[in-house]
A protein has these predicted regions:
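Cysteine-nucleophile amide-bond enzymes
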Residues: 1-202
Length: 202
């Protein structure tokens, strides 16, 4: 998802992406997410209210038990802090990693290039030592904790755009362990493309 706020706009510009936020739908109209207020569980209505566009990707082979474990993880770390340090480190990384996306390079080389830059530029925190998360880090950790990792890359390396590109038929900067399935848009929103605003319905 994304919003029309300055923070969302900045993330989209630095990541050259149309999205700036990711969350997990837990069922029963509840959404788990990490925002500036920390890790929280909010209603779907509230999540939609602070998004100018919102679309849904599904993990096709997620089991009911894994879904339960994701919910348990979200409840366990609810009210934890937001990983501001990780976001500050992420800004220059989002800029320098663009060199790995040049057309002459193969997909494997691009993934190795981005991983190498991440190791050099981003901090590494042990899973048991974490006290805070940013949105895509939280989503990545939640699926990993449930035994259904989206990628084997460190969660602190993953941006909302990286998760979006793990959908079927797309190419992600990090090798996906699971290809996500596009379900549909809940809010079409406004997309930034070629220096202008355009509306999309799909």
């Amino acid at each position: 998802s994304s919003s029309l706020g300055v923070t969302s706009f900045g993330i989209r510009v630095f990541s050259t992406s149309s999205v700036s936020h990711v969350a997990i739908y837990l069922g029963e109209n509840n959404v788990a997410e990490a925002t500036g207020a920390g890790v929280q569980i909010v209603s779907l209505k509230k999540a939609m209210k602070h998004s100018d566009k919102l679309f849904v990707l599904r993990v096709p082979d997620l089991t009911p038990q894994q879904a339960t474990e994701i919910t348990a993880f979200a409840n366990k770390i609810k009210d934890s802090g937001y990983n501001y340090r990780g976001i500050v480190e992420f800004i220059p990384f989002m800029v320098t990693r663009q060199m790995c996306s040049l057309n002459p390079f193969s997909e494997d080389f691009r993934q190795q290039c981005v991983s190498g830059l991440a190791k050099a530029q981003l901090s590494s925190v042990g899973e048991g030592d974490k006290k805070s998360w940013f949105c895509s880090e939280f989503v990545t950790d939640a699926f990993a904790k449930a035994g259904h990792p989206l990628t084997l890359a460190q969660s602190g390396w993953i941006s909302p755009a990286d998760l979006m590109h793990m959908r079927i038929g797309d190419v992600s900067a990090f090798k996906p362990e699971t290809q996500l399935q596009y379900v549909g848009h809940l809010k079409p929103g406004i997309y930034i493309k070629a220096g202008r605003f355009v509306g999309l319905t799909q």
